[in-house]
Curated annotation (Swiss-Prot):
Keywords from the UniProt entry: Amino-acid biosynthesis, Cytoplasm, Isomerase, Lysine biosynthesis
GO cellular component terms attached to this protein's record: cytosol
SUBUNIT field: Homodimer.
Amino-acid positions noted as binding substrate in the UniProt annotation, renumbered to this chain: 13, 46, 66, 76-77, 159, 192, 210-211, 220-221
Organism per entry: Vibrio parahaemolyticus serotype O3:K6 (strain RIMD 2210633)
Family to which the UniProt record says this protein belongs: Belongs to the diaminopimelate epimerase family.
Protein name per Swiss-Prot or TrEMBL: Diaminopimelate epimerase
Site (Important for dimerization): 270
Signal peptide interval: none
Function, in words: Catalyzes the stereoinversion of LL-2,6-diaminopimelate (L,L-DAP) to meso-diaminopimelate (meso-DAP), a precursor of L-lysine and an essential component of the bacterial peptidoglycan.
Isomerase listed as a keyword: yes
The keyword Transmembrane is annotated on this UniProt entry: no
Main localization (coarse): cytoplasm
Gene expressing this chain: dapF
Length: 276
């Protein structure tokens, strides 16, 4: 099997992006794991696959696979790179691009300055739709992780997120708590774990331990989930700067029932081809 690919990143969250419209490529879980290896493969956090639309009302179908080969529902940083990729490769000349995903639809708007704004849809807080095991919907849940008691928010941005507020992200025990939360029994499909430091009402710092990928330089859907939880808990205003290890995103949300918007960069690194 021979195919072309692009390497891209959104704030250091890096991707291998493959056009599966003009190329016939099949990715097994084992192949994805081998390609994701940073020593013996291409190296990436996620594989992004561009497919022809499943829905006639959309332009493309967007699939995401983590480095462990598991397919996931959403990746916000990947969505921005997806939009740049389909324009760079001449698959569309639109500036507003509609895509379907495993969990729904998104609109990707390419800005004049090269940044991309993504309509991430309406944040979902109903426990059974996240999914999250809870008797009823709450703004804050008490959870045990190892020997720690955590006060967390839970939300789906098309994929599940748990968010806990910390005093300082630099000293947060992400290496220990991240894996414990990722595989916590209350999240039957596992979860992305966000550790949020509130700097001010319009600025947070964030680290994210991603389901199936570990801690990454940036997580777009994680930034969205953290801001949504922060606004719901009364900690943040409607427009928030999110500082991640890899850079900054801007998130805006007018509250429950409204769509949430994320704006940030998408960088093309190089093109390559593989035979495997």
């Amino acid at each position: 099997m021979h195919f072309h690919f692009s390497k891209m990143h959104g704030l250091g969250n890096d991707f291998m992006v493959v056009d599966c419209i003009t190329q016939n490529v099949f990715f097994s879980q084992d192949l994805i794991r081998r390609l994701a290896d940073r020593h013996t493969g291409v190296g990436f956090d996620q594989l992004l696959v561009v497919e022809a639309p499943y829905d006639p009302e959309t332009d493309f179908h967007y699939r995401i696979f983590n480095a462990d080969g598991s397919e996931v529902e959403q990746c916000g940083n990947g969505a921005r790179c997806f939009a740049r990729f389909v324009r760079l490769k001449g698959l569309t000349n639109k500036y507003s691009i509609s895509v379907s995903t495993k969990k729904g639809k998104m609109i990707l708007d390419v800005e004049d300055d090269g940044e991309v704004t993504v309509n991430m849809g309406v944040p979902e807080f109903e426990p059974n739709k996240i999914p999250f095991k809870a008797k009823q919907k709450e703004k804050t849940y008490i959870m045990r992780a190892g020997d720690k008691t955590l006060f967390c928010g839970a939300v789906s941005m098309g994929n599940p997120h748990v968010v806990t507020v910390v005093d300082d992200v630099d000293t947060a025990d992400v290496d220990t708590l991240g894996p414990l939360l990722e595989s916590h029994e209350r999240f039957p499909e596992r979860v992305n774990a966000g550790f949020m430091q509130v700097v001010s009402r319009d600025h947070i710092r964030l680290r994210v331990y991603e389901r199936g990928a570990g801690e990454t330089q940036a997580c777009g859907s994680g930034a969205c989930g953290a801001v949504a939880v922060g606004i719901l808990q009364g900690l943040l205003d409607e427009s928030v700067k999110v500082s991640l290890p890899g850079g900054e995103l801007h998130i805006s949300w007018q509250g429950p029932g409204k769509p949430l918007f994320m704006t940030g960069p998408a960088t093309h690194v190089f093109d390559g081809q593989l035979s495997c």
